[in-house]
Amino acid sequence: MRHTGRALILLIALALNLSALGIAAAGDWPRDYVVKENSESPDGHYAVLVQSMDAATGQEDNESGVYLADVKSHTTLGNIEKVDYFEHQNHRGLEVFWAPDCSYCVIENDGRYGADTISILEIKDSSFVQTEIGDRIQKSLDGAMKKQSHDSEMAGDVSPHFRLGTDRKVRVRAVSQNNPKQFEDVKTYYALFQGTYDLAAKKWTVTDARSITADQSGALDVGYQNPDFENTTYANEDDRAKSLDEQMNQVYQAAKFILPPARFAKVKHEQTEWLKKRDATSSVKARCELMEKRIRDLQDVLW
């Protein structure tokens, strides 16, 4: 009996230690939970579980836990903290971005206007370590807008973009504004955050936040987005070409703003030579294909 009590105390202590370290323990697949759409890892091993819409709408409280799961073993690796979302929930969003080697992911929990929380989930055997990075991004963006507006209460939304590599570094670009509803009587301020979080070092190695203009914010937002060319439809090839040309010009303007003068001079020369090649192409379809590739190449420069 004495040994049983001691073992129970040790188990409780271990659970508390894991929680303090941000490590979530494994468990059974929760009832009425489904795999969140587009949350699976590239190798199909892991996914994020959310409560089904039917189950969530039938409960009294408004909170719905979210889990990281091992799909192959049909078990959970643990509850994801500071994330509250159920299937197809209105005015909220949940996005998952996986590293190429599936060893970690970024989970973005969105509210009505921008991200509420942003965390890195690093898989460790049958559990994971959660690191919250959204607070630093939010504070940096708010700081840039406070400086610009001279208002200590100034705050804005966060629209983040991520690139995850096999070097275990999370590259973040985020734009922000304080007036998402675009009220005419509210002066709008904009800001940009650029940062790199090193998982191995457990710290930000690069951070930069600055105020920007409305035009710069719009161009950067297009520049950082992952275009879905394959699933975008147009009435005809001419409309497609016009849309792609507008996108390319926005990304080019983003590069002009963000790059050092010497680096942009090289991009400008490359763009001039590329335009000659495009304009010499007679087929509209072929020109569109050239523009899609050029957009992606210019986007890579922004990172």
Predicted regions and their residues:
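Bacterial N-terminal signal peptides
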Residues: 8-20
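Extracellular-facing segments of soluble proteins and assemblies that are Gly/Ser/Thr-biased and enriched
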Residues: 92-129
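Recurrent small/Gly-Pro-centered beta-turn motifs in extracellular repeat architectures
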Residues: 51-52, 108-109, 174
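Positively charged n-region of N-terminal signal peptides that target proteins for export
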Residues: 1-7
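N-terminal alpha-helical modules
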Residues: 215-303
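Short N-terminal edge-element motif at the start of the domain
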Residues: 35-98
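Acidic, small-residue rich beta-repeat scaffolds with periodic aromatic anchors
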Residues: 22-40, 56, 113, 117, ...
